[in-house]
Regions:
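Intrinsically disordered, low-complexity basic tails and flexible linkers associated
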Residues: 1-162, 166-168
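Single-stranded nucleic-acid-binding OB-fold domains
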Residues: 118-122, 126, 136-290, 308-309, ...
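Histidine-centered catalytic micro-motifs
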Residues: 295-304, 503-506
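Helix-hairpin-helix
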Residues: 299, 650-662, 938
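Mg2+-dependent phosphoryl-transfer active-site scaffold
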Residues: 309-327, 332-381, 385-598, 640, ...
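Extended low-complexity intrinsically disordered regions
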Residues: 579-626
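Helix-rich "cap/lid" substructures immediately adjacent to catalytic or cofactor-binding pockets
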Residues: 608-652
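Catalytic DNA-binding helix-loop module of base-excision-repair DNA glycosylases/AP lyases
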Residues: 642-645, 656-668
Length: 996
């Protein structure tokens, strides 16, 4: 790497040769006068012919400076000049007249092709050449003088211009593999049908990985897809260190690749063997709304509509970018996008109108299960918080009481809960547009129109399918479609009701149309291909163009003026209660009862007066627990556990609740988080070990009380309270409890209804989207119906377009959401049946009511409502069974039994040898006896036991910490422990170990 300052005496301008990259044969130049710099460089063309690239002020000027510039890997020089420079007269450079490096074996090119010097040849030539400032040709030709001091490249170009190469050198050229930029025409991947050499393709990285092989080799594989097809790309590296240069290749990145296409013996298909790779130019969809006064979209569907594809963040970001004063969210029959939309609206500063496209039926049906219900679409928009709560109530009623294949809304119900809501006439499926389509009289149309706050018209493409419907024989041309919209506008004027132009957007941009075709193909009948309307979000200009058949003033009125007026009537509201406030249920005297039971239990265990360490820990925990309103949560957990204990079942606590001493004293967990200690159950003599010399209380040796001779209890696992509720004790407690699976879990669920009231307890709802494998099947069905053939990589690319769209709803297996008695559930969420199944069948086949869940996914409201995790688990059930069989109390089993502990390092206590175990198992862990022990029986954990040979309970706890999480043990703690650098107790096994 060399740096020089070059001055042109003739022009008086200064050009700075910022860097000479000897690896890439590139010059990076900064100049005040670009034109003068170009003249100087052109005068130097003979001397700089060996360079690959020349960058001037960040631009590649290679071709401009020297059109015949030779670059490694590309024989661009005329044959005579190339031969003179690098031919037979040069003993260091060979020539191959028959084939290029990229040509397949046995094939000859029609024209002689010269083999170019290797990069090492060029590097050696540069190294052997005299310094640039000593070359007379430069000063004689261009009148250039040199000085060695100049500013660094970093001081001239922004940091974003640099890419770190594998060798640690900064590069600005985007080259990922190879020595130069890729030249040549880019081919569509779909054109690759046979083996060929030197092909160039560009596409999106669908997935990539670098797999280590034997003998330090490495195989890089990449799934690449463009807009036509996909192909697997490979690159072998003799040294895995050389593969580091491709660590910058990531999923969804755009890359350009050159290589040879060959039939791969492993995959059986064509594979592109990579010779060069660089970052490609991503084809971004970049639509803009340039209108001075933009419109408002009042009809839009997110992925929560079964047929919608609009991503929540994409629509809010786009609306903000387009400076739309508001955007409405109106999914089909649901409002499940609201929680995330609220967060995104705050993030982007975008006003959102919260609404829904409902299914209107004329009257309350006598038989809701009738298949003959005629429904119409209707838009509901919330104007204020009252309207929002009424919208929630309508959603609940439509899902719980009036659900028949879809959530229906009887007209009387809409009248009852109209306060705070605006009703729009919706699309071609709305009752008003249907009446227009059917040719109803003006009087009837005006009567229908007066039910709505505004009428809708949409682009002709949305309704173009009417041209092909036999039952609408009168609709034959686009002009007929225009007349339908004109009729809506006419009736709106007569009735004094504003008319608004809406997109009925189901996908964001026109380029996403194929994604929706793929999504809807799942409902196509085999062999029947359906076309779908272009229901994408229009810009203001596009919408005005859609209604250009109207007078300009009228088009602007329905597209801009009226939509903005509707938006102005809707306040800025938040669908959920304030994010920072948690509404916990109230139980009279819960705080006092919790405090009293804790001190009572502490005195029972440790005597009175309480030791200072006990008093301090109780004060540390009880103060923030009560001050932050969490006392009731502890008390509820205490009641649930006690109810199960009284029935003879143990309850297992999960997660970090064991770090709370208050939870221990309240009987919520049997884990004691105090420092390891002895305590006498008779006279309360105690001894605490706070110097870290003991890993846990269960590791202490058996000992009798020095005061009274009673066998001492041993306890304490030294867990800080901050692990559970944070350093300030302000984290919402997450108390997960394992109840005995089967009867006891069901009883615990029933007991919550007794505690809080049946009408205040609901199962936590979940929302399931289309998963990758299902989306893959959608694409295959789409292709098969159309007689298309896609390879798996291209299918994987297309499936990403439909993945994540809502598929169904469900319930958390253990989550219970509790609404305070003095609050309405509709302050938080609507309700529905899980998977919309109003009726289920029990084991006998009898019909039983379905499970009522929250309409919103429980994650979005768990910080606002109390969520109880009442899990069913086999362990408490098995422990109870063993207690019944043996008569041994599980709470009095010793944790330092020598034979039991020996199982984690040897099978001898089982009465079998390692050889017998090896014959039976035949894999790792043959020298330990843990194969039948839960959490320790897998080959991975048995291998850990062989490496560590744990000797006590606290070491077993650390093993469990090491075995959970990515790279906690492998490539981390294992290497440190087996190399002897640290002892097991010194390695980080859990977050508790990371303390200052």
């Amino acid at each position: 790497m060399g740096k020089y300052r070059l001055k042109s005496k003739q022009k008086g301008s200064v050009i700075t040769l910022m860097e000479v990259d000897t690896e890439c044969q590139a010059w990076y130049i900064q100049a005040d006068d670009r034109n003068a710099a170009l003249q100087v460089l052109k005068a130097m063309s003979d001397e700089i012919r060996c360079l690959r690239n020349i960058y001037l002020n960040g631009d590649d000027v290679t071709e401009e400076v020297c059109p015949l510039l030779m670059t490694i890997g590309d024989a661009s020089l005329p044959e005579e000049e190339f031969s003179e420079m690098y031919g037979a007269g040069n003993p260091d450079v060979g020539m191959d007249m028959h084939r290029t490096e990229d040509s397949p074996e046995g094939e000859a090119d029609s024209e002689p092709v010269f083999k170019l010097p290797s990069i090492r040849d060029v590097q050696a030539a540069i190294a052997a050449a005299p310094p640039v400032e000593d070359r007379p040709a430069l000063s004689q030709t261009a009148g250039i003088s040199f000085s060695s001091e100049l500013p660094s490249l970093e001081s001239v170009l922004p940091a974003s211009a640099f890419q770190l190469s594998a060798s640690g050198e900064k590069r600005t050229d985007g080259i990922l593999l190879g020595r130069s930029h890729i030249k040549g025409k880019i081919s569509d991947i779909s054109t690759i049908r046979e083996e060929q050499g030197g092909i160039v393709v560009q596409g999106t990285v669908i997935d990539c990985e670098c797999r280590e092989l034997r003998e330090n080799r490495c195989l890089f594989t990449m799934k690449l897809a463009d807009e036509t097809d996909g192909i697997l790309c490979k690159k072998f590296f003799e040294k895995k260190e050389d593969a580091q240069k491709l660590t910058g290749v990531k999923k969804n990145m755009t890359v350009k690749v050159r290589g040879n296409v060959q039939l791969d013996k492993f995959t059986g298909g064509l594979v592109l063997n990579i010779s060069q790779m660089e970052q490609g130019k991503e084809k971004k969809i970049n639509h803009e709304d340039m209108a001075e006064t933009p419109r408002v979209e009042l009809h839009l569907h997110t992925k929560m509509s079964l047929d919608g594809l609009i991503d929540n963040e994409e629509i809010i970001r786009t609306a903000a970018k387009w400076k739309h004063p508001a955007v409405a969210i109106t999914d089909h029959g649901v409002i499940q996008a609201f929680p995330q939309i609220q967060t995104l609206a705050a993030k982007y500063g975008q006003k959102v109108i919260y609404g829904m496209e409902g299914y209107l039926i004329d009257e309350v049906p006598e038989d809701i299960d009738s298949d003959r219900q005629q429904y119409s679409h209707i838009i509901l928009l919330a104007k204020n918080i009252t309207g929002l709560r009424n919208l929630y109530r309508l959603v609940t009623l439509s899902h719980l009481k009036y659900y028949r294949k879809r959530p229906l809304l009887p007209r009387p119900l809409l009248e009852e809960f109209r306060d705070g809501l605006m009703y729009g006439s919706a699309c071609v499926m709305g009752e008003f547009f249907r009446a227009v389509l059917n040719g109803d009289s003006d009087e009837e149309l005006i009567r229908l129109a007066k039910f709505y706050d505004y009428l809708e018209v949409q682009p002709l493409g949305n309704n173009e399918f009417l041209l092909y419907e036999d039952k609408y024989a009168a609709i034959m041309t686009k002009k007929d479609l225009q007349e339908l919209n004109k009729k809506v506008i006419e009736i709106g004027e007569k009735a004094g009701i504003p008319v608004c132009a809406t997109s009925d957007a189901h996908y964001l941009f026109a380029e996403y149309a194929r994604d929706r075709d793929i999504l809807l193909s799942n409902w196509e009948k085999p062999g029947k291909i359906e076309s779908h309307p272009p229901v994408y979000l229009r810009t203001t200009e596009e919408m005005l163009e859609e209604f250009s058949y109207l007078p300009k003033e009228k088009a602007e009125e329905i597209v801009i003026t009226n939509t903005r007026r509707v938006a102005e009537q809707c306040e800025v509201i938040e669908p959920l209660a304030e994010e920072w406030k948690s509404y916990n249920p109230k139980i009279a005297g819960a705080d006092d009862k919790l405090k009293a039971m804790c001190y009572e239990k502490a005195v029972e265990l440790y005597g009175e007066p309480l030791p200072e360490i006990i008093r301090d820990r109780l004060d540390l925990e009880l103060t923030p627990i009560i001050n932050h309103g969490y006392g009731v949560l502890y008390y509820i957990a205490h009641k649930l556990v006690k109810h199960s204990n009284d029935r003879g079942y143990l309850v297992g606590s999960r997660g970090s609740v064991g770090s709370s001493f208050v939870a221990t004293l309240a009987g919520i967990t049997e884990v004691n988080p105090l420092p390891p200690h002895y305590v006498c159950p008779h006279c309360h003599w105690n001894q605490f070990f706070t110097d870290g010399s003991v890993g846990g209380g269960f590791d202490l040796a058996d000992k009798k009380c020095p005061n009274c001779g009673t066998e001492l209890n041993k306890d304490g696992h030294n867990i800080p309270f901050a692990v559970f509720l944070g350093f300030d004790g302000d984290k919402v407690p997450d108390i997960d409890l394992n109840f005995s699976s089967g009867d006891d879990q069901a009883v615990a669920h029933k007991y919550t209804e007794e505690l809080f009231g049946r009408d205040n307890v609901f199962r936590a709802g979940t929302i399931a989207g289309i998963q990758d494998k299902t989306a893959f099947g959608f694409v295959k069905r789409y292709a098969e119906n159309r007689g298309l053939t896609f390879n798996d990589i291209f299918i994987e690319k297309l499936s990403a377009g439909v993945a994540g769209v809502k598929r169904t709803t469900g319930q958390h297996p253990a989550g219970i959401m509790v609404c305070p008695r003095d609050m309405d559930i509709h302050n938080f969420t609507p309700l529905q049946y899980a998977a919309n199944k109003r009726w289920l069948k029990d084991e006998t086949g009898e019909k039983i009511p379905g499970t009522i869940t929250t309409h919103f996914d429980y994650h979005s409201i768990s910080g606002r409502m109390l969520k109880l995790d009442i899990l069913g688990h086999d362990d408490p059930k098995v422990i109870r069974m063993l207690q019944d069989i043996t008569g041994i109390d599980p709470l009095h089993i010793p944790f330092n039994d020598e034979k039991t502990l020996s199982l984690f390092s040897s099978p001898d206590a089982l009465g079998i040898t390692s050889e017998q175990l090896k014959a039976a198992v035949g894999d790792k862990g043959i020298t330990v006896g843990a194969i039948g022990l839960p959490e320790f029986g897998t080959p991975f954990v048995r291998g850990m036991l062989e490496d560590t040979r744990p000797k006590n309970f606290s070491e077993l706890v650390r093993i469990s910490g090491f075995s959970h999480g990515t790279n906690v043990w492998l490539n981390n703690a294992r290497d440190l422990i087996t190399s002897g650098k640290v002892k097991q107790e010194q390695a980080i096994s859990t977050r508790d170990d990371i303390r200052i």
